[in-house]
Regions:
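Feature representing long, continuous alpha-helical segments
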Residues: 16, 21, 25, 59, ...
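Extended hydrophobic-aromatic, low-complexity segments
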Residues: 8-12, 31-35, 54-58, 77, ...
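A generic structural motif
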Residues: 3-7, 17, 49-53, 136, ...
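Short, hydrophobic beta-strand segments
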Residues: 2-5, 42-52, 147, 218-230
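Non-catalytic interaction/regulatory segments
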Residues: 30, 41-138
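Terminal appendage regions of diverse proteins
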Residues: 30, 124-242
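Active/ligand-binding-proximal structured segments within catalytic/core domains
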Residues: 1-47
Length: 242
């Protein structure tokens, strides 16, 4: 087995346990696992919750997990524990797992206690760091979080830095000025669009005057026959409104 691959899977697996508990701390104990996927690329965790998590909640979950990582807590496994004893200890069961009469219990200090037979790190510090990438809906009442750990977080940050550098170069400003620059450009575009709309309205009014001057009166109805191919759709809409 590739050691690097196994190590990254272990990071993501232990991080899944930490995040599960962190979700319950932030959202309440009703936030229970509804499915999960762990591989070397990252982790995916489905859990019961009736609505989208807000930014502050996601940040708090991230903070809790990273604090536990920095504490470098020993990750202890208790083998061949009777299933009833494990439940009495308060161990949470992972979704979709079938348990024998004797089970393996994974403990991260007094923070996380779950039944699990997978590969894990020996101490939380081995995870390195933890980053939530996305949070969304799977189905009614079930949310999904995707996250990364270890070297994948470094790759993620590198990608963001490259994008920021490219944006600052294109906008000809420092990174700290990017948001202000974009806001200024949006305001400028909005102002120009308003000017264009005003000009189109004025042109349409002039065109309307010309059309009415060349109209034909049939009883009480003014009839205008004109080829308007040179007029844009937006100008034509303004003209019709007149």
């Amino acid at each position: 087995v590739n050691l690097s691959y196994r190590q990254q899977v272990a990071r993501n697996h232990t991080a899944t346990h930490l995040m599960h508990k962190a979700l319950q701390v932030v959202l309440g104990e009703s936030a229970k696992q509804a499915g999960s996927l762990v591989n070397a690329q990252g982790l995916r965790f489905d859990f019961s919750y009736p609505k989208a998590m807000i930014k502050e909640q996601l940040e708090k979950v991230e903070q809790i997990v990273n604090e536990k990582i920095l504490e470098n807590i020993p990750v202890v496994t208790h083998d061949k524990v009777e299933i009833e004893k494990a439940k009495n200890m308060g161990a949470m069961a992972m979704f979709g797992e079938k348990y024998d009469e004797h089970v393996r219990v994974l403990q991260v200090d007094n923070f996380s206690l779950e039944l699990c037979g997978g590969t894990h790190v020996q101490a939380s510090g081995e995870i390195g760091t933890f980053k939530i990438i996305s949070e969304g809906s799977v189905t009614s009442g079930v949310r999904r979080i995707e996250a990364i750990t270890g070297t994948k977080v470094l790759e993620y940050i590198k990608g963001i830095n490259e994008t920021m550098t490219q944006a600052s170069n294109e906008l000809k400003c420092s990174r700290n000025e990017i948001v202000a620059k974009i806001t200024a450009l949006k305001d400028k575009i909005k102002s120009q669009e308003q000017s264009v709309t005003a000009l189109q309205s004025k042109l349409a009014q002039n065109k309307l005057s010309d059309l009415l001057a060349n109209s034909t009166q049939v009883k009480d109805i003014q009839i205008v026959i004109e080829n308007l191919n040179e007029i844009s759709v937006s100008e034509l809409e303004i003209l019709c409104d007149k």
